[in-house]
Amino acid sequence: MKNTLKMSLAAASVMAAMTANAGISIVDTDEGNFSVGGNVELNFNYQDRESHDNNDSEFNQDGRVLIEFAGEKYTSNGHYVGVKAQPLFESTGNIALDDAYFEFGKKDGWAIKAGRFEAYDMFPVGLDVFLEYSGDTANDLYSDGSAYTYQAKEARGRGSDGQIMYSQTFGNLYVEVGAMLGDRSNLFDGGIEGKYHGEQIDTVKDSFLVRPVVAYQMGDFKVAASVETNLVSDAIVANGVDISDRTGYGLTGNWTSGDWSVNANVAYMDAVDENNLTAGVNALWNNFGLGYIHAINEYENKEFSSWAEGDVNVSTWYASYAFRDVLEVQDFSILLGTYYTTVDNKLDQQSDASAFAEEDDLGARVRLFYEF
């Protein structure tokens, strides 16, 4: 009876805390903290894609519930250890994982983080309720025969293998050096079964990717630069050519003042027989967001003959609007989003006539979002 009463009182306290604030602080003292929080995200989607089979309109719903467990323990000299786990329960019935990492360091100083996480965002896209790109590729997955919208995130993180990062703050200056370890063949669609410029990927071994970032805050302005590259030769090979020999560069700037936030981004990838340049700008004013991204893919026939020669460009517009605190419920939002994207094939020569199709895709989404 006493245990039942204690559990009932604890449950009532937790419910009261959840009602008052987003997230629950189970422990919050000078020696450390532990909290449970999360969010719910459900999307109702419409898409009209020429790249889709039969060119049919698509209607679907997707989403997930994220639960976050986070804790830190402090020492009297300012050092700390921390852990975070974010399991995802998808509306499809699958269970996935966002972040899962351990970190230690000195508050407002240096830190070492290991596990699964995302490093510094070198291509922030603002309020991107719905953002996709023409073709069969994504901005973090290379698919042969499709244009690639490179965004300086091949070594950013949340991969299936190991990851570690060192970061430090020096006043307005922030520096981080991240590394991803292990099999990175999943960067290419199909992995070991996939292709690159028409050639079969035939051998794979573990990669070692590094990604240093330097950022500086100047009043309302922030600027950051990065580079990412693989240090292991012949980590991914197609027809005797080391296609893991890839080096990318990123530059991003942000201006935030009052209700305005503006991002400008540039990313460039130097890869085998192709170069990928992407530029983007987006703005957020109050709850309205608007953005544009343009990708230029230059192909040549040096290592692989007769695949493609010339340029393929991708242009993408997107817009979003957020209704906050719907029904006067704190942290409950309804978001509207739309995008339009197109491919412009300017190749002088290509071996596969079905590749790099000039397709126009568009979509619209209503998102229900609640943070708890």
What are these regions (language model features)?
Residues 323, 359-372:
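Outer-membrane beta-barrel "beta-signal"
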Residues 1-24:
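Gram-negative bacterial Sec-dependent N-terminal signal peptides
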Residues 50-53, 141, 184-205, 230-246, ...:
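Solvent-exposed loop segments that connect transmembrane elements
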Residues 205-207, 211-322:
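Detector for outer-membrane/organellar transmembrane beta-barrel domains
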Residues 78-81, 108-112, 172-177, 220-225, ...:
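Repeated loop/turn-to-beta-strand initiation elements of outer-membrane beta-barrel proteins
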Residues 32, 55-65, 95-100, 158-162, ...:
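Residues that define the transmembrane beta-barrel architecture of outer-membrane proteins
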Residues 38-44, 83-87, 114-116, 177-181, ...:
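Transmembrane beta-barrel strands of outer-membrane/channel proteins
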Residues 24-45, 56-184, 215-219:
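Outer membrane beta-barrel
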